[in-house]
């Protein structure tokens, strides 16, 4: 046990990860992903149309929407629909999810159709965007498998797996997969998106307290690589079940 983390986890230890496929019945892909107490419902919906800028080009599109239930956190938040617009954080996160998933898709093989990943946070305890990316990939694969089974596409457009994890410096120690208690009190917070080839798709890093050093950055990236490998294994296990 580590006494430096509120949860007692070791610095390089993920929270328990659960990836449950087929969580709802109507969407082509549906996954409940849990990173500890963070729970996100990820659904993949297929539509036989593309945005205007892609019409007639023979390419598909992958996009994402992200939202939180009003009581996903300690206190209730108004629904963004009631406010009449999405917040900046919501837009930032859903664009991140969309970019991350497009990085693993051959859009020519998808044809002129759109797959939308809807990521709804049921309960938030840190790492909602990384959980959303990790779960949305599995939902995306299930949706693609439906298209293949129906004969709508001839070639699998999935280029490889994608997963994401948070890392940070908490009380002077680089740690993996921050929960809310750590995320709200860390010196550095970073989200790392990677593919199964070890390539980095996106890095989002911020010094919350003091500037981080190069050696701390290297340590954080090393932790992220370890965590993503474990998440990729969890994705594969879920898809093989």
UniProtKB/Swiss-Prot annotation:
Subunit (UniProt): Homohexameric ring arranged as a trimer of dimers.
Record flagged with keyword RNA-binding: yes
Molecular function terms, GO-annotated: 3'-5'-RNA exonuclease activity; tRNA binding; tRNA nucleotidyltransferase activity
Chemical reaction(s) catalysed: tRNA(n+1) + phosphate = tRNA(n) + a ribonucleoside 5'-diphosphate
Protein family membership: Belongs to the RNase PH family.
UniProt-recorded name of the protein: Ribonuclease PH
Main EC class the enzyme belongs to: transferase
Binding site residues for phosphate: 89, 127-129
EC number: 2.7.7.56
Any one GO BP annotation for this protein: tRNA processing
InterPro entries: ExoRNase_PH_dom1, ExoRNase_PH_dom2, ExoRNase_PH_dom2_sf, PNPase/RNase_PH_dom_sf, Ribosomal_Su5_D2-typ_SF, RNase_PH, RNase_PH_bac-type, RNase_PH_CS
Organism of this sequence: Stenotrophomonas maltophilia (strain R551-3)
UniProt superkingdom: Bacteria
Keyword annotations from UniProtKB, A to Z: Nucleotidyltransferase, RNA-binding, rRNA processing, Transferase, tRNA processing, tRNA-binding
Job description of the protein: Phosphorolytic 3'-5' exoribonuclease that plays an important role in tRNA 3'-end maturation. Removes nucleotide residues following the 3'-CCA terminus of tRNAs; can also add nucleotides to the ends of RNA molecules by using nucleoside diphosphates as substrates, but this may not be physiologically important. Probably plays a role in initiation of 16S rRNA degradation (leading to ribosome degradation) during starvation.
